[in-house]
Amino acid sequence: MRYEYVPLKDQYEKEIVPALMKEFNYKNIHQVPKLVKIVINMGIGEGSRNYDLIERHANELAKITGQKPIVTRARKSISNFKIRKGMPIGLKVTLRGARMYNFLYKLINIVLPKVRDFRGLDPNSFDGRGNYSFGLSEQLVFPELNPDEVRRIQGMDITIVTTAKTDQEARRLLELFGMPFKRG
């Protein structure tokens, strides 16, 4: 296994762990919350009828994350949405390890500042178990994508899964990573 420099992982080990141990009075270093994975989900409504659209968005998601996405399929038929069981309805990527830290670094420092009318992430989007979810309305904010090649603007949901027991611990962990939450 080759060594890869991951700036956020170094920051976590050298700065964030000691700060959280002091702030929450942890006795053991293993009690400190850490990132487990980042899941990026892109729901494609018309994709069930247009396989070219799924391929195009899969390539975009692969460029953004550096990992090939999985096609998610409908679990049951819903006639109102014209969906049958087994039809492709979206794409999903799960990032762990170095790719996860690099994606988070890119998200915090490059992508979120490029979002139009961005005033910070909603601090109330935690799920009660220390996980944070938010959505991006378009994929063009990622530097890997050329706006001329993108045919259809598509949003995505991003979920950051942590080992934190409470939302307060998870929020503090993400704040120390540099996540821009709304003040107030």
From Swiss-Prot:
Gene3D superfamilies: 3.30.1440.10. Disulfide bonds: none annotated. GO terms for biological process: translation. One of its GO terms (molecular function) is tRNA binding. It holds the Pfam family Ribosomal_L5. It comes from the Bacteria. Belongs to the universal ribosomal protein uL5 family. This is one of the proteins that bind and probably mediate the attachment of the 5S RNA into the large ribosomal subunit, where it forms part of the central protuberance. In the 70S ribosome it contacts protein S13 of the 30S subunit (bridge B1b), connecting the 2 subunits; this bridge is implicated in subunit movement. Contacts the P site tRNA; the 5S rRNA and some of its associated proteins might help stabilize positioning of ribosome-bound tRNAs. This is Large ribosomal subunit protein uL5. It comes from Thermotoga maritima (strain ATCC 43589 / DSM 3109 / JCM 10099 / NBRC 100826 / MSB8). The gene is rplE.
